[in-house]
Amino acid sequence: MGTGKDGGGYLRAYNGEGDESAYVGTGRMGGGYIRTYNNSGRETSYLGTGSDNSGQLRIYDKLGETRSYIGDGYLQAYNQFGERTIFLGTGTNGGGYLRTYNFSGQESIYVGTGADSSGQIRIYDNSGETGSFLGSGYFRTYNRFGKLTTFIGNASDGGGYLRTNNKFETETVFLGTNNANEGLINLNDKFGQSFWIRLNKKN
């Protein structure tokens, strides 16, 4: 127990080997914090005030590498390679969201609030490109070239429909409700030209 160079008080605890195991005190910026250490002298946790004057909690692995972080409205987790794997928090627009990342730090999933304040889910492929999207009354899938391949959702007039596209994003199939609120099936060739259509049971 004592007073540091900056005038702040502190308390240190030691294990049976005489190694420091905990520190409670005041930092250089005037904020308070607690640090704990393992029997190898590696820091295992930090609870206190960060450089931005907000509160934070850091959890470290046995080697002293950050594994999780909570602070300023969000939580982050890291793998053994130091790559972020999870982000849970609040976006700049005030909406909450969750992001997950693969072992190399590339985003794999987004679940949360979109720019239009509606809920959405995005699934990314191993190249970081959107593979599928669910939100605002529709579902979309994309191929590895970023081209839209499937759409299931609501039309502007309230009817539901399914569209499929080829790898060049040219429409090949339409199955759904037309403007007359009747069922419609339309098949197109690879150039998007219709070659078979069924409007109702009489045609």
Annotate each PLM feature:
Residues 1-203:
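Parallel beta-helix/beta-solenoid repeats that form elongated, surface-exposed shafts/blades used
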